[in-house]
Amino acid sequence: MELLSILRFPDYSMDGGRLMTALEAKRAADNFNQELFKRTLEKATKYFNKEIEEAACQGSYEFCIKSDNDYLIMALGQKETIELFHSSDLQKEIKKRFRVDGFLVNFEKGYERDYVRVSWREPY
């Protein structure tokens, strides 16, 4: 209820104005969440592809990244990194996207930090 009174604009009538601005606020929040999801998905895909290429050049078949990795945070951004490790929908989408190309992506919860492990069987 407090949120509704904060969002009320004087241009609207009392009841209709509150309802209208609450709906607008919900839409704005939904749009922000969708944009964050898309932005994180694209940045994470690009970052993981770069890491796959680097690991493959060294003859490795997997790599692991910690949630507090400075390079990951710089590449994705703070909000995007948090979204990556806390959004199960985003994790499912990343797993699905990489599975098509033969990569296995696992998100693991640790005691102090989370991890993402990407592995593959054949030489990349």
Task: List each model region and its residues.
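A general, composition-driven signal for non-globular sequence regions
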Residues: E2, Y12, M20, D89-Q91, ...
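A generic structural signal for ordered secondary structure
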Residues: C64-K66, K95, F103
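Short, charged/polar micro-motifs that form catalytic or ligand-binding hotspots
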Residues: E80-S88, K109-Y111
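Well-ordered, non-membrane alpha-helical segments in soluble/globular domains
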Residues: T45, L84-I94
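C-terminal edge-of-domain segments
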Residues: R97-Y124
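An N-terminal amphipathic alpha-helical segment
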Residues: M1-I82
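A short, charged, amphipathic alpha-helix used as a generic interaction element across diverse proteins
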Residues: K50, Q91-K96, V100
